[in-house]
Amino acid sequence: VIADEVQSGFGRLGQGMWGFANYGLEPDIVTMGKPIGDGHPMGAVIVRPKLVSSFGSNTGYFNTFGGNPVAAAVGIAVLDVIEGEGLIENARTVGAYTGELLDALK
């Protein structure tokens, strides 16, 4: 299972950190992008160890942008803000309110 959390991750759905968790899924691969850096260009792919264990030793792959300390600091700051400002709960509240407004248009 591959979960694409580029749009739905980092609490944007208002129910936990990841959209896939709302469906009881345990993905093998998770992709994430825009929300991890909140405007700073960064992304990540999280892979189960059993799937990636031989990748590095068999391919010789490397990335000149991987492990950038500025991007890592941005990612940590974003996580701190999500937690410190209660943004997951805020997404839940705003989402419920928006849903009510949309239902009223029926």
Give, region by region, the residue ranges found by the protein language model.
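Conserved N-terminal phosphate-binding loop of PLP-dependent enzymes in the Aspartate aminotransferase
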Residues: V1-K106
